[in-house]
Amino acid sequence: MQQNGDPRRTNRIVRYKPLDSTANQQQAISEDPLPEYMNVLGMIFSMCGLMIRMKWCSWLALVCSCISFANTRTSDDAKQIVSSFMLSVSAVVMSYLQNPSPIIPPWVTLLQS
């Protein structure tokens, strides 16, 4: 009971076709918008911290830029990430250089009255 022929079914063989790398990259970018959202939020909070001198906005900007950096890919632009970090760090530094008193949470004034 020995078979001399090839037992594999040639009509069932499916050849490997590599996917287009640019299409995969575009699909991966559109799947996760979190770094871009955090970058925009970081910029907004940095501007609020610099212009309105709100210390908690400056710290939120730093947190948002850290989250944005943690979720970025290697294909993303490094200049945008560095500028976001520099803006948020400068907001924290400037808010404490202008007024070195400790941060007062906004809800403290609501609890006192």
Swiss-Prot record:
GO CC terms of this entry: endoplasmic reticulum membrane
GO BP of this protein: protein insertion into ER membrane
Residues spanning the signal sequence: none
Record flagged with keyword Lyase: no
GO molecular function: protein folding chaperone
Parts of the chain that traverse the membrane: 81-97
Major place of residence: membrane
Subcellular location: Membrane
Keywords: Membrane, Transmembrane, Transmembrane helix
Protein name: Protein Asterix
Native organism: Caenorhabditis elegans
